[in-house]
Amino acid sequence: MRLALDAMGGDFAPKAIIEGAILASDSLPADAEIILIGKEQLIREHLSTLEGNKSRIQIVHADEVIGMAEHPTKAFSQKPNSSIAVGFHLLKQKEVDAFCSAGNTGAMLVGSMFSIKPIEGILRPGIAGFMPQESGRFAVVIDVGANADCKPEMLAQFAVIGSLYTKYVFGIENPKVGLMNLGEEEEKGTILTLAAHQLIKELDSINFIGNIEGRDLFNNKADVIVCDGYTGNIILKMGETFYDLVSKRGYDDTFFNMFNYEEVGGSPILGVNGNVIIGHGISSPKAIKNMMHQAYQLTQAKISEKIKNAYS
């Protein structure tokens, strides 16, 4: 299994990325290889100063970098030799099984939409986030930022996509799907959620439990939480602050530690023809390591194929 990693993406690249790659190489199953994409000489210089298992790390040269502040569409089209563009080329040509980056999120979305492209039948791909639950596991939240404005049909697709991910990656046989709303009653909500509710409840392939409220985010009520990207991104960013708050106050709590972005590593873009994971711009080596482990799980579970089958 060949897992590609953008060595130039992130606020602390390439050092933190390369350190994370070595941590992943030390801990991933034996069939995994890591392909670092970026400026080869710079990558080799960093590798030479670090200890760890480097035998499963290869390098693909890319002499351009898409900066965090660059316009995603313009940068992706004008920098075909950037580490992100090269990563998507390798993924499209099936030379790698997954592509991960902590770089420009917009460019990663552009690559997903216009390079490997959405799966036929999928209106728009969604980004999946992960919300800690009192039980000690995570619930999938989709969408958390790919689509600020959504159509009801998109939320219905997110319900299916999120359910497939939860079943095959988390191993939950009949995941409970909830629609994030301002009340449990079916007649409550916005024009979007009212229409989406009617579409989702007609889906025989998922276990829809109806609307859920903000107070249900952490109480194990739903395994999949469906929402538009605007709402989901607010939920995700709010959750990230919990770990910062308790850490500053000197608390060490197992539940709140799950809100540490490093523990998850990244967020998959679901509904496209390939395995793509985006990481936090401030990703540490630990976060990169966990993002690579997530890429391994995503690839092993064959989520893209499962989604294709659902819409074939």
Curated annotation (Swiss-Prot):
Alphabetized Gene3D superfamilies for the sequence: Isopropylmalate Dehydrogenase
Catalytic reaction annotation: a fatty acyl-[ACP] + phosphate = an acyl phosphate + holo-[ACP]
Keyword tags: Cytoplasm, Lipid biosynthesis, Lipid metabolism, Phospholipid biosynthesis, Phospholipid metabolism, Transferase
GO cellular component: cytoplasm
Keyword field contains Transferase: yes
GO biological process: fatty acid biosynthetic process; phospholipid biosynthetic process
Pathway listed: Lipid metabolism; phospholipid metabolism
GO terms, molecular function: phosphate:acyl-[acyl carrier protein] acyltransferase activity
A Pfam family per the record: FA_synthesis
Enzyme class: transferase
Annotated EC: 2.3.1.274
Protein family (similarity comment): Belongs to the PlsX family.
Protein name, UniProt field: Phosphate acyltransferase
